[in-house]
């Protein structure tokens, strides 16, 4: 199961007493600010959680898996996430979830 933005909004509604509309807007604005910073080439550091970084990848050779034809993979910029130490240790120490 995955945590969704709708579930985050519901949690803010339940725990902080925000209206559903305000909770949804808060979640949207939070992620929009992260997107804006990354679009502007900035690193995003969330203390106790982790860092979103931008990496430039060079063009490299690739292969079409259906035809086997060699094709170039174009140079591009990608977003990477590096979890912080607090997040890493919480995940490592969490009890495995039974399915």
From Swiss-Prot:
Q: Where is this region: Disordered?
A: 49-75
Look up the domain of life of the source. Answer: Bacteria
Which Gene3D superfamilies does the UniProt record give? Answer: IHF-like DNA-binding proteins
Q: Which Pfam families match?
A: Bac_DNA_binding
Keywords attached to this entry: DNA recombination, DNA-binding, Transcription, Transcription regulation, Translation regulation
Note whether Amino-acid biosynthesis occurs among the keywords. Answer: no
Q: Which family does it belong to?
A: Belongs to the bacterial histone-like protein family.
The function of this protein is: This protein is one of the two subunits of integration host factor, a specific DNA-binding protein that functions in genetic recombination as well as in transcriptional and translational control.
Q: Which HAMAP family match?
A: IHF_alpha
Q: What is this protein called?
A: Integration host factor subunit alpha
The organism's lineage is: Bacteria, Pseudomonadati, Pseudomonadota, Gammaproteobacteria, Enterobacterales
């Amino acid at each position: 199961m995955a945590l969704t933005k709708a579930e985050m909004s519901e949690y803010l509604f339940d725990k902080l007493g925000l209206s559903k509309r305000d909770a949804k807007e808060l979640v949207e604005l939070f992620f929009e600010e992260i997107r804006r910073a990354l679009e502007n080439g900035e690193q995003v550091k969330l203390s106790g959680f982790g860092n979103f970084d931008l990496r430039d990848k060079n063009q490299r050779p690739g292969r079409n898996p259906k035809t086997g034809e060699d094709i170039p993979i174009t140079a591009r910029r990608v977003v990477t996430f590096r979890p912080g130490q607090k997040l890493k240790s919480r995940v490592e120490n969490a009890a495995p979830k039974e399915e």
